[in-house]
Amino acid sequence: MQVWPPLGLKKFETLSYLPPLTTEQLLAEVNYLLVKGWIPPLEFEVKDGFVYREHDKSPGYYDGRYWTMWKLPMFGGTDPAQVVNEVEEVKKAPPDAFVRFIGFNDKREVQCISFIAYKPAGY
């Protein structure tokens, strides 16, 4: 049994305790979300990919939670490869950015899943 080292390895969101997703695994996740009918927007964050305290000593709701959206959400997207290609584009634009993938349910108007699709080196 292996224990995860507690120092220097921050955890982020869903799937963060797994090794980085391969392209095939990312395609499978995206396909699952598209089959569910969820909209796949992408977000990126250059400064910090985790919740941090910005305005006070205690964490507030807005501290480090809102990222910049990459282009527009992919409404009507049906091809997982197209979505993964967008992830590759985000990785090139700001190469030191975190890339977050979201599954948004437009019927219930809620975010159903969110996970880090790419972390820069050193995280």
Curated annotation (Swiss-Prot):
| Places the protein is found | Plastid, Chloroplast
Q: Name one GO molecular function term.
A: ribulose-bisphosphate carboxylase activity
Among InterPro entries, the record links this protein to: RuBisCO_ssu (IPR024681), RuBisCO_ssu_dom (IPR000894), RuBisCO_ssu_sf (IPR036385)
Primary localisation category:
plastid
Q: Which GO terms describe its biological process?
A: photorespiration; reductive pentose-phosphate cycle
Q: Which domain of life is it from?
A: Eukaryota
Entries under Pfam families matching the protein: RuBisCO_small
What are the Methionine derivative sites (modified residues) in this protein? 1
Which terms in the GO cellular component ontology are assigned?
A: chloroplast
Q: Which keywords fit this entry according to its UniProt record?
A: Calvin cycle, Carbon dioxide fixation, Chloroplast, Photorespiration, Photosynthesis, Plastid
Entry's family note? Belongs to the RuBisCO small chain family.
Relay the record's extra comment.
The basic functional RuBisCO is composed of a large chain homodimer in a 'head-to-tail' conformation. In form I RuBisCO this homodimer is arranged in a barrel-like tetramer with the small subunits forming a tetrameric 'cap' on each end of the 'barrel'.
Q: What does this protein do?
A: RuBisCO catalyzes two reactions: the carboxylation of D-ribulose 1,5-bisphosphate, the primary event in carbon dioxide fixation, as well as the oxidative fragmentation of the pentose substrate. Both reactions occur simultaneously and in competition at the same active site. Although the small subunit is not catalytic it is essential for maximal activity.
Q: How does it assemble?
A: Heterohexadecamer of 8 large and 8 small subunits.
PANTHER family hit by this protein:
RIBULOSE BISPHOSPHATE CARBOXYLASE SMALL CHAIN 1, CHLOROPLASTIC (PTHR31262), RIBULOSE BISPHOSPHATE CARBOXYLASE SMALL SUBUNIT 1A, CHLOROPLASTIC-RELATED (PTHR31262:SF10)
Q: What is this protein called?
A: Ribulose bisphosphate carboxylase small subunit, chloroplastic 1
